[in-house]
């Protein structure tokens, strides 16, 4: 039986999950998830968001409980570091820089790239590198390694297709979703008012641009996965301390990738800034008055 706790609507409201895009940008397929509009901005029905989030979290919990693998995907700037942080926190996998076509459907090619990455790392760490290669050659190998690491760090230990795909921003990650559909991999996804919920098995209506919203989603996803992992370990009799060892190693990799991204001087987006109320029914009348959401 699932241990997933009920979702707090106030928490969703405080994170700005209810802010959709401007009404001119909406996707009619999202109509049933929209509560109303204010100042030409759609307001998402958080009662549905809370209910559907619970369903999605239960899917994550059950997947990990049965020793399944989860692949978190979001390559947008404001979600990149967050999704890596929480995927690694729960010992799962992620793609947060660029989705390479065929990451799921052409795994052999991706596996070759991972093998190349590991070979470069081994060469650069060896004494042979100092003796057999010039500084220019070493620099060239380092650049190739860094480029591969940005794309593959989160899946380098993924030896088979994932059992569940978790996506933030279905528009940006449509290629990943299409590949998952071809392989019959179920998809959990945050769907904003400009999104297409088709091909999403577990849709979660919500703001997919706000950093605060994204962090809340990822925190909930990771907690559900950790609960599933804990249950799985109890059943199999595995020492739960091994989970921490796995997470520590993953976090080291995450810090390395984060430094690589900082060296590219990627711009950062700002948090959503708006007034929140204690009851969702008040959101339509007041929460949009200070409408500086990330969605436009």
UniProtKB/Swiss-Prot annotation:
Keyword Protease: no
UniProt keywords, alphabetically: Ribonucleoprotein, Ribosomal protein
UniProt superkingdom: Bacteria
Stretches for region Disordered: 252-296
GO biological process: translation
GO CC annotations on file: cytosolic small ribosomal subunit
NCBIfam families on file: rpsB_bact
PANTHER family, per database record: 30S RIBOSOMAL PROTEIN S2 PROKARYOTIC AND ORGANELLAR, SMALL RIBOSOMAL SUBUNIT PROTEIN US2M
Protein name (database record): Small ribosomal subunit protein uS2
Source organism of the structure: Rickettsia prowazekii (strain Madrid E)
């Amino acid at each position: 039986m699932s241990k997933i706790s009920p979702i707090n609507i106030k928490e969703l409201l405080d994170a700005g999950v209810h802010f959709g895009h401007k009404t001119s940008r909406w996707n009619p397929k999202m109509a049933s998830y929209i509560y109303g509009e204010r100042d030409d901005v759609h307001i998402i029905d958080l009662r549905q968001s809370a209910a559907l989030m619970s369903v999605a979290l239960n899917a994550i919990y059950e997947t990990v409980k049965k020793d399944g693998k989860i692949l978190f995907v979001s390559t947008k700037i404001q979600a990149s570091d967050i999704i890596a942080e929480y995927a690694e926190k729960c010992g799962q996998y992620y793609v947060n820089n660029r989705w390479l076509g065929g990451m799921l459907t052409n795994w052999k090619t991706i596996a070759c790239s991972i093998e190349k990455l590991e070979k470069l790392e081994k060469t650069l760490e060896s004494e042979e590198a100092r003796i057999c290669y010039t500084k220019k050659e070493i620099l060239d190998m380092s650049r190739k390694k860094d480029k591969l690491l940005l794309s593959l760090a989160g899946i380098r230990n993924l030896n088979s297709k994932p059992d569940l795909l978790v996506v933030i921003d279905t528009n940006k990650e449509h290629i990943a979703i299409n590949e998952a559909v071809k392989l019959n991999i179920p998809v959990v996804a945050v769907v904003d008012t400009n999104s297409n919920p088709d091909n999403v098995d577990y849709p979660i209506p919500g703001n997919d641009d706000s950093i605060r919203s994204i962090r809340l989603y990822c925190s909930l996803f990771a907690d559900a996965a950790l609960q599933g992992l804990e249950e799985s370990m109890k059943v199999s009799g595995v020492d739960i301390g091994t989970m921490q060892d796995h997470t520590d190693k993953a976090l080291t990799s995450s810090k390395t990738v984060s430094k690589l991204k900082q060296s590219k001087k990627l711009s950062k987006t700002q948090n959503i800034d708006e007034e929140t109320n204690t009851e969702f029914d008040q959101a339509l009348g007041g929460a949009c008055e200070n409408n500086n959401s990330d969605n436009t």
